[in-house]
Amino acid sequence: MFWTRYAGASVLLFLMLIHLGQLYPRNYMNNFGCEECKLKENNIFSKPGAPVYQCMGCCFSRAYPTPLRSKKTMLVPKNITSEATCCVAKEFKQVLVNDIKLVNHTDCHCSTCYYHKS
């Protein structure tokens, strides 16, 4: 009899926790403190009438345990594998500002992070 009450209370508590977890919007928690990937004006290099834009914002990233099959093929085995995409320029144009060649981004998207490539 005691075990039945204990199991019933545990199931009820579990269902309440699931309900509370669904009250929070998921997209708010995922992007906390970071805006989506888009063009923003670079205030340092922009001049009146000649704005310079660059891609800024957040994209997808995650970490998960490394599968055993993959771990066996690694030169230096690691327990955690991570994947990430970065906010990068999809299209750009070369511009000249104060005799300095700059890359002015014209379109952005989430793609492979350059610093992760080897």
Swiss-Prot record:
GO terms for biological process: positive regulation of steroid biosynthetic process; thyroid hormone generation. It is found in: Secreted. It comes from the Eukaryota. It holds the Pfam family Hormone_6. Transmembrane segments: none annotated. Keywords: Disulfide bond, Glycoprotein, Hormone, Secreted, Signal. SMART domains: GHA. Its main location: secreted. Gene3D superfamilies: Cystine-knot cytokines. SUPFAM superfamilies: Cystine-knot cytokines (SSF57501). Disulfide bonds join C34-C58, C37-C87, C55-C108, C59-C110, C86-C113. GO terms for cellular component: extracellular space; follicle-stimulating hormone complex. Belongs to the glycoprotein hormones subunit alpha family. Involved in gametogenesis and steroidogenesis. Heterodimer of an alpha and a beta chain. This is Glycoprotein hormones alpha chain 2.
